[in-house]
């Protein structure tokens, strides 16, 4: 299949049905604390390693990774966008549960991996929202490591986590 062909050849050659000129790879790890009485999750540190090809402007790449981490934290812990029967129920930004600056740790350790790409501009691959999904999944795995509770639905709000912790006992 075209998708399998692209996945099997992520960087070394162009293929006819390529979905994108390059694929980016990243991995995140999260250190957190869980208050089992309230279900509140406090993110203490995030490690974010991302292969961006050539980092043309490393400071901007670092900022992009930090922004993706913040988005991933919101995605995992608080953000919601509700619809019913094709109608938007979450009508205002204030109701979406976007993370506040206090929800994002000061300790985000970005690791820029530079594996240049022959077809990217100046060897770049891109970074975009690459850290978003990896951060959310790293948070869920860290919650599992801390509590033994496997979260399968997002966002994992304090009330939802508190209920899952109570079921565990």
Predicted segments with their positions:
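C-terminal catalytic domains of large/alpha subunits in multi-subunit enzymes
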Residues: 1-169
